[in-house]
Every structure is written in structure tokens, then in C-alpha cells.
A protein has these predicted regions:
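Extended ligand-binding regions for polar small-molecule ligands
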Residues: 5-11, 15, 20-21, 26-29, ...
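Short beta-strand-to-loop elements that line the ligand-binding cleft
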Residues: 24, 42-53
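Loop/turn elements at helix/coil->beta-strand transitions in domains of secreted/extracellular proteins
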Residues: 19-20, 41-45, 64-65
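C-terminal functional modules
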Residues: 154-201
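A ligand-binding cleft/hinge motif common to bilobed small-molecule-binding domains
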Residues: 33-40, 54, 59-90
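Structural motif corresponding to alpha-helix initiation and N-cap regions
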Residues: 11, 53-54
Length: 201
């Protein structure tokens, strides 16, 4: 969770928001995190609360509050929908971490398992520096770890229990890249959302 402000407010840090009016959804953890952040930093604020998320966005865009707070990914998306996106910025501070990820339909366990394991393979590849451009060399490296040989389908058949071929993880990494590559391509700093990875995955 973070904060979005108009650049004209003249602040570059959430620690400069003492006395600000903040648009927020009522009855949410977002509202609780907001109160905790201001209290922990010895600052005051004026909550401007709404039941629905679109009401919060509309009120912020209409100038009814100085600040909008919600998940940073939501702020980035909502910034692109304002009348003048370049007039707004998401402040650098992350005041709470909200886990966001893929969801699947209840009752389709095979598909849920595939989504879970593919996501884990892409995150592992990112953590270990295996990208869409380097996955072939890792796969063909005789000195690759046994773990990578299994993941990439060189040894064993880890895809069988998922109903997939043995190169399922290799194919995913080769086709879409690791988690970091996907992140940068869809929501990273060179996209309209401009979400920095620092402090997230």
C-alpha cells in the first residue's frame, strides 16, 4: 500500500503528508494501515472515506482530497485513468505489503496446480538469474544443478503430476521470461504504470 498525490502538492515523501486530507475506502485494511502509518510517524491527517473504490478515485481526481491511498499497483493503474496522469505521482514509501497474485476458479484443482507451479518456476528463475535468453544455456549446461536439470526437464519428469510435458518450466521461461521479465514488460518502469520492483518481487 502506498500514496498517490498531485505533483503540485510539492511533496516527495509520505513523511511530508502531515495534515493532508486522504481519500480511502472505509472498513478496509487500507484504512487501518493509513491510521497506523500516520500514528507511527507522529502525523495527523483528515480521512475522506467512501464505501466504493470508484468513489475514492473520483473524489481524488476531483480534488476533494490531497492524497489517495490503496495498493500501489492499484494507484499506478488509477493514475493512468486520471484526466492528466503526468500531474500525479505515487510516493516511494510502501506502508504495507498486500499479496497479489493469480487466481483460479474453485473446483479446478489441476489448473490451480499448473498456475501455482508455473508461477513458482518463474519466480525461482528470476531469483537465480535464469531468463528467456539464458534458459537454453542453463538447460544445455552439463554442470547445471540437479534441481535445474529436473525443473527444465533434462532429468526426470516433473510435469507428469501436472499433466504437462517434462519441459513445462523450460517452455514457460523461454516463451514469457522469468518473473522479473514479465513484471518489467507489463507493469515496470518502462510501462504507463511505472511500478518499480524495489520492495516487491
Amino acid at each position: 500500500q502506498g500514496f498517490m498525490v498531485r505533483k503540485s502538492l510539492g511533496v516527495s515523501s509520505a513523511l511530508e503528508l502531515d495534515g493532508a486530507s486522504v481519500c480511502v475506502n472505509t472498513g478496509t485494511t487500507t484504512e487501518l494501515n493509513l491510521a497506523d502509518f500516520f500514528r507511527a510517524n507522529g502525523m495527523s491527517y483528515e480521512p475522506v472515506v467512501f464505501e466504493k473504490a470508484d468513489e475514492v478515485v473520483a473524489a481524488y481526481d476531483a480534488g476533494r482530497c490531497d492524497v489517495h491511498t490503496t495498493d500501489k499497483s492499484g494507484l499506478a493503474a488509477q493514475r493512468t485513468k486520471t484526466a492528466q496522469p503526468d500531474d500525479h505521482m505515487v510516493l516511494p514509501e510502501t506502508i504495507s505489503k498486500e499479496p497479489l497474485g493469480p487466481v483460479t476458479r474453485e473446483g479446478d484443482e489441476p489448473w490451480s496446480d499448473i498456475v501455482f507451479w508455473v508461477l513458482n518456476a518463474l519466480i525461482t528463475a528470476d531469483e537465480l538469474g535464469v531468463s528467456s535468453s539464458s534458459v537454453d544455456s542453463v538447460k544445455n549446461d552439463a554442470d547445471a544443478t540437479p534441481e535445474w536439470k529436473r525443473i527444465l526437464g533434462v532429468e526426470g519428469d516433473t510435469g507428469a503430476h501436472l499433466g504437462l510435458g517434462k519441459e513445462w518450466a523450460y517452455n514457460a521461461i523461454k516463451q514469457v521470461g522469468n518473473y522479473g521479465e514479465m513484471y518489467e514488460r507489463h507493469v515496470g518502469m518502462n510501462t504507463p504504470l511505472e511500478l518499480a520492483r524495489d520492495g516487491s518481487l
